[in-house]
Amino acid sequence: MTDSQITAQILTESLKYFLKYRDQTVVIKYGGNVMIDEKVKESILKDILLLKTVGIKVVLVHGGGPAIGELLEKYEQKSQFVKGLRVTNKKTAQLALTALAGKVNKSLVQDIIRLGGNAIGVSGIDGKLIEAKPISEDLGYVGEITAIHPEIIERINQTDAVPVIASAAIGLDGEIYNVNADTAASRIAGSLCAEQFILLSDVRGLYGNFPDEGSFIDEINLTNLEKLVKEKKITDGMIPKIEAIKYAMQEGLGQAVLLDGRVPHALLLELFTDRGQGTLINH
């Protein structure tokens, strides 16, 4: 077959997936080390634009990547951590918001427009999208999410724009709170009853015995996932992601995928091919 015929065959095979996801909501969490490489970022954003073009309601939720740490260092704010959570005073919370909603969010919106799409950037503060309360006095302005109000996302989804959400939160006291971006994204996915929640990271997915490639898990249900957690076969860094996914699936999320965002066009390979690319988690 010629290259053109191969391309046509691939598109034909993808048709059933285009139809499956058309008019469905797919929430994508983008953050961490995946944000560092500009080529990786462009590949992810191009995939997102294609998803939008074929009629999928794509919602992009992001963390701060290295931007928060860089801004805190610039203003000589030392980071302290308690049980993996950054201790956040009021100034740190304001700087984190600047990095998230200012630098990172608007950069993503700009890049999507540059690539030929459209995007509207908001933070969890806008429209009280993400509400939170303080976890403890020791952590300062670190929040536990108490409610999601997705109306602003639903309105954006009625347009040709991709909603790009910075994972900051607002309290009933009017204060800004730092919340876990994975948790924020999963809660948004649950509130929208999304068909799919894709959590991009810098690992392939779940393993029964990490990093043994022979133990890679293509698909798993919640019951067997619980067994892996109890058997301590899930690495510590994955536990918060798993807990976030479990909560969202209880709230109405259809499926979740842990996916290596560094793989070129990983989103397309996951959604539009039979084999997929990462670990699919279902009910």
Curated annotation (Swiss-Prot):
Binding site for substrate: 64-65, 86, 178
Subcellular location: Cytoplasm
GO biological process: arginine biosynthetic process via ornithine; L-arginine biosynthetic process
Site residues (Transition state stabilizer), renumbered to this chain: 29, 241
Keyword Cell wall biogenesis/degradation among UniProt keywords: no
Superkingdom of source: Bacteria
InterPro entries: AceGlu_kinase-like_sf, AcgluKinase_fam, ArgB, Asp/Glu/Uridylate_kinase, Glu/AcGlu_kinase, NAGK-C
GO cellular component: cytoplasm
Pathway field: Amino-acid biosynthesis; L-arginine biosynthesis; N(2)-acetyl-L-ornithine from L-glutamate: step 2/4
Family: Belongs to the acetylglutamate kinase family. ArgB subfamily.
NCBIfam families according to UniProt: argB
Name of the molecule in the record: Acetylglutamate kinase
Gene this protein is translated from: argB
